[in-house]
Every structure is written in C-alpha cells, then in structure tokens.
Amino acid sequence: MSRLFRRLSTLLLCSLLVLGVWLTQPLSVQAAEIRNKVDDKIAETAGKVDLNNASVRRFQQYPGMYPTLAGKIVVGGPYDQVEDVLKLDLTERQKELFEKYKENFTVTDPEIALNEGFDRINDGQYR
C-alpha cells in the first residue's frame, strides 16, 4: 500500500511541477504558442486579398471577378507580385477588371495551410 501511495504522490508532484512551470511562463510566450501560421498570414495581408493564399470566395466583393476571373487567378499562382496576374491568359475585359481592383490585392508567400487540397477553389462555405 505504501508503494502505491509513493507512486501516486510522485505522479501528483510531477504533474503539479509541470503545471506550475507552464503557468509561470510570460503571457507572450503562451500566446505565441497558441498563434498559428494562418493567423499570422491573415495579419500580414492588412485587409487585402492575398493572391497566393485566398480562396475564390474572397473575390466576391469585386463585381465581375467571381467566379471566372477569381478561378483563373487562384489556379494561376503563385505570384511574385500583384502585376504577375496580367501574364495569365486573360480577356481584355478581365484585364480591365483586374486593373480596376488591383490596389485591393497583395502577394505573400504561399502558406501550405491555406493551399492544401482544393480549399482555394471550394472552401466548403455554402449559403
């Protein structure tokens, strides 16, 4: 019985030690552990549509771009700069539309968490 009591006591003390170390970390360290790459990527774009990481649905706010031109942009990446979109096989009307809205776009490095699978084409949001 005393052997069992010692083991349980040791386990409890170790658990408390680990919990104590975790709780005494500065909040900034804890927050850094909770943040993920997607949160960082969203913060990096400053409200603009990231051409290398956005889904086609992000283009709905720009009349005429969704779904055809948005699909071409999403599939045609990755891009080094916003103007690289104009190298795609676009109609004159699509080029005009892109020029009209290009100040609303930005380019960051592609993030695997945002580009995996077909989520950029169909991100599963339905009305």
Swiss-Prot record:
Membrane topology: Peripheral membrane protein
Segment forming the signal sequence: 1-31
SUPFAM superfamilies: PsbU/PolX domain-like
Keywords: Electron transport, Membrane, Photosynthesis, Photosystem II, Signal, Thylakoid, Transport
Pfam families reported for this sequence: PsbU
UniProt KW Membrane keyword: yes
Transmembrane segments: none
Domain of life (superkingdom): Bacteria
Gene3D superfamilies attached to this UniProt entry: Photosystem II 12 kDa extrinsic protein
One annotated GO biological process: photosystem II stabilization
Cell compartment(s), UniProt: Cellular thylakoid membrane
Electron transport recorded as keyword: yes
Any single Gene Ontology cellular-component annotation: plasma membrane-derived thylakoid membrane
SS bond list: none
HAMAP family: PSII_PsbU
Role played: One of the extrinsic, lumenal subunits of photosystem II (PSII). PSII is a light-driven water plastoquinone oxidoreductase, using light energy to abstract electrons from H(2)O, generating a proton gradient subsequently used for ATP formation. The extrinsic proteins stabilize the structure of photosystem II oxygen-evolving complex (OEC), the ion environment of oxygen evolution and protect the OEC against heat-induced inactivation.
Family classification: Belongs to the PsbU family.
Known partners and oligomeric status: PSII is composed of 1 copy each of membrane proteins PsbA, PsbB, PsbC, PsbD, PsbE, PsbF, PsbH, PsbI, PsbJ, PsbK, PsbL, PsbM, PsbT, PsbX, PsbY, PsbZ, Psb30/Ycf12, peripheral proteins PsbO, CyanoQ (PsbQ), PsbU, PsbV and a large number of cofactors. It forms dimeric complexes.
Name of the protein described by the UniProt record: Photosystem II extrinsic protein U
Gene expressing this chain: psbU
